Amino acid sequence: MRIEAASPQGDRLAQCLWNAQCLLLDVLKFDVAADKLVSRYLREHRELGPRDRHVVAETVFAVLRQKRVFSHLAQSGGGTLERRLVLLGARCCTTDAGLQAAIAEDEWTWISQVSTVDTRTLPAAVRSNLTDEWFAQLTEAYGETDALALAEALNTAAPLDIRINTIKSSRAAVRVEFNTAPFDRATCALAPLGLRLKGKPALQKTDIFTSGAIEVQDEGSQLLTHLLGAKRGEMVADFCAGAG
């Protein structure tokens, strides 16, 4: 779906926000997995540079992660609801100075006002960014404090964990390899073959990835494979649900 207004000219961030708004209209239908829609949109808009793509994608995902809080805050203000959600999401991946320069004065005034809201005063279910029903079930199982902590973890962008393929390399060797590359890494706390990378480095472009020496796998899944204790001739299938 496309919004009626034309793409703004000039300011790159303003164009990113326009693209994020177009994309969000489709994503909020929730009839296709969000990551697929984002990937398709970025493929169709090759004029967007790497930084632009990052802003568009992260703005949309920020809205999805914090949709209930953002929707609460976006009850006020002018323009469309999707526009207000995009402005809130953009604050998660842009600077205030850059955002202020890219949007209208009244939009910045609104952003500044809602930013003063203490979200800790909102109802617990709203703060969790979950439905009332789901939050009630978590609260019944774990108590409100732990339910909120779990919800916060679920709504936080996952770190990038990799698993070393011991047939082709070792964790020590991979650590040395990353010492020569622009990667900030740390040993996974529990998984014996895991490393955790900070940020979202372009692993696909590295020789160590294309050679099969490492694979992307979260630490929890790595631990499950060890707990299963697969023997020679057995296989563990790790089905990834992704954003679906």
Question: What is each of the regions a protein language model found here?
Answer:
Residues T206-D207, H226-R232:
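Glycine-rich helix-loop-beta junction characteristic of Rossmann-like nucleotide cofactor-binding loops
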Residues L160, Q222, E234:
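Glycine-centered loop/turn positions within well-structured domains
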Residues G244:
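Glycine-rich SAM-binding Motif I of class I
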Residues A202, S221-Q222:
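Short, glycine-/Ser/Thr-/acidic-enriched flexible segments
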Residues I208-I214:
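Class I SAM-dependent methyltransferase Rossmann-like catalytic core
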Residues M1-K205:
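Class I Rossmann-like S-adenosyl-L-methionine
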Residues G233-C240:
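Conserved class I S-adenosyl-L-methionine
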Residues L138, I162, V216, L224, ...:
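Conserved hydrophobic/aromatic pocket- or pore-lining residues that grip, position, or stack substrates
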